[in-house]
Amino acid sequence: MTADYSFLKSFAEYIIDKLGKDTKVQIILPNNFSCLELKKILTDKYKIKLPIIIPFNSLISKKIDSDYISKIEELLILSSIITEYKELPLNKNESLKAAELLRKLFNDLIINNIDIKLIEVYNNSNYWQKIYKFLEYCFLRWQEEISFTQKQTKAVYKLKLLQEEIIKIKTGHKQVILAGIFKPNVFFKRFEEELKDYIIHYNPASKQISDGISYYEPNDIYEETKQISYICSRNKDRRIAIVTNNNKLKRVYCNFLDKYEDLLGNDLRLTNIGELLTSIIKILCNNFDLKLLFLLLKNPLINCPTVQQLELMLSNKNRFISSPKYLLQLQFDNEDIREYCRNLIDILFTDTPHNIQAILTLTKEITEKLLPTIWEKEGGAELLEFLTNLTAYSKYINSTDKKDFPKIFSFLLSNIKYYKNTDAASIIIGRPEDLALCEFDLIILPHFNNENWTLSAKAHPWLSKQALQILNIDYDEIAPTLYSDYFNLFLQNKQIVILNAKKYDGKLSVPSNLFLKLEKGSVSPRDLITGSSNYMDTVVKPRYDKSIEIHSPSFPTTLSVTEIETLIKNPYGFYAKKILGLRKKDHIWEEPKISDFGNLIHKVLEEYSKNYDKQYINLNLLDKQNALINIGNHILYSTILPSYTKKTWQIKLTAFSKAFILFDIERRKNCKEIYFETKGELRLNIVGQDIKIIGIADRIEISKSNNITILDYKTGTIPTKKEIELGLSPQLIIESLMLLENGFTKCNSLSLLCHPQPLLCYSRESRNPVINNNITIAYVKITSTEPYVHTTEITLSIETLNRHKAGLVKLLEHYITNQFFSYDLNLSKYNDYLHLSR
């Protein structure tokens, strides 16, 4: 059957029929949204003078700023007390989280008139006794500090308001109607008990559920979100309720919706204006950091094209600048960017606040300079009030370490909500208790599983189960049928869609027990839209066949040995980098990479090796080691890097320095010539096109017996022997071919020694040629752990090198002739261009 029951409409009829138009009555509903809905029904349909219709919370929420202590001040007072308790050492951030729990506990003790000293007699466990002593200390100090403020706690103030309302109802002989389903709490229970002779209860009727119930299990939460968006887009002319009490999921759903009314509220910390203030505070509380600076500048409220241009300028090596003054030393393309940097430095880095109050005051000033209209933005009024209050209460946190304050600020800000609502929105997002009494054309129950729709008792962190029972403080006093009652009311709407993603946060979802109780025949498994056989196609089809190749009419004339390796392993990456000229920039937030450390080691070893004969040859082992370390420190000092990276790399350099000196001394014993960072080239003519392959050999050794070894220093992964034999790692092979072709022209000895057919090695003393049919290639792995230096050597014969040369020629012929570069061949471990080939 089609559902025709509406609780509020039924209640409106009850008001007219049973009470009459002129009856004086006070109607109390569970929440404000239900009150607004009921008023609308009464005015639109019955045209009557409205009785008093209020939510229960309004009885205890009249506010005058001076009447009670604010939540923020109370949390700060409690956290200060917790921090001063030496037997349970907690930092300021941890103490704030503990303060939130203690605040509720202490207020419950006060409201229920329970003596804190009673709790220590309920459990003789040594652990719990320590906890109870801590609680007693905090409670007594909390009462003392609250008395100094000459204000009441909010809970005591609420109790006072409630008592005043109870007296007013009794003396005025008012009739009170409690309509709907109320979440029980200490205030509501007291209200019911004291006014039992004045209260009329109007509860929802149990009706037959709708036959328009559909159930679907998307694969994950993002597919579930798309389903919600799809349903809403197909039902724009209908009134829709999305029921959830999960704020995190709500934010995901809202990303796919246009107009909606949000009854859950937004965490002010997660809004653009909240993140703007948090970013400024992080900058003021820490040493200069480009990542923190751009976290601020890329906020949507102040981001602009100049920020994007500046980010490009500061990518790669400039991303490690350690002071704002370096911003003005950049080579600017135009004066506008320079002026932007100058203004930025004046606003952010001119003043240095020394305590929390000064930080908060300066934060407000900086915010208004960066965005003069900030307080007019959504949530601006709430944020300004929060900032003003926190500044006033900063005496409780002035002793906090500056670096800890951003976390404290963020935690406190997370306690503040603001509500963003769209006029005339047909989509309402709210909790079950907000929406259960109202009528909708379509109800969507997303993420309908035990996590969200089954109440489970949780252990209290500060009280044992026995203590809770004896003290009669029930933290899980919500009636077990509460969510079942909400669910039954939702099922009496016209159409209900139940969704439950199969996975969430990497875990499988378990359907709610409430859903399992439904009769099988009452639920349609998929068809939510009449006449639609497929609910939603969630499979994204590829835009093209991945085997398609890219065509290029030209081929480069100069290649490096590393580009040859890219051509072999990742043709599309070669095309993007070498032909299109695309280069990956290291973003500002990227940490120094292992390749950056490798570049440092190459510079250090080059500097040491090239000056060895002039400066270090006669030094002892320790002095040589110190010389190597000093070279590294000098290079690090002149390199822009984060200070923590410099310290880490200094430690690594010191760790392997002795092992490298011993390695170097041992290698030199059998060498008569050594060349370092030597440039070479290999010239080829491929199908009429001249190709030059260039490379730099880290180290080339000529032994006393005229054997040649080419060495390559590696701080990263070295290729396997199989990869070298197959030509997948051709760097040292191509450098060996350069030797055969006399490609190292600046090294006279190599030119004399090398000739391609076969490799002739001449004795410099006798000038008589000695046939040598091999070249040795060696990878020297350098690490900061033992073994610090490890050498892998492979001997390549002339015949093997000639086969590799033929393979190289064939490879180049293929690409020069065919002019196609495949998408789907990718053997690289690291691929900066993978996203471009999709």
UniProtKB/Swiss-Prot annotation:
SUPFAM superfamilies from the UniProt entry: P-loop containing nucleoside triphosphate hydrolases (SSF52540), Restriction endonuclease-like (SSF52980)
* Alphabetized InterPro entries for the sequence: P-loop_NTPase, PDDEXK-like_dom_sf, PDDEXK_AddAB-type, Restrct_endonuc-II-like, RPE4
Question: Record's Pfam families?
Answer: PDDEXK_1
Which superkingdom heads the taxonomic lineage of this protein's source?
Answer: Bacteria
Q: What is this protein called?
A: Uncharacterized protein RC0550
What is the species listed in this Swiss-Prot or TrEMBL entry? Answer: Rickettsia conorii (strain ATCC VR-613 / Malish 7)
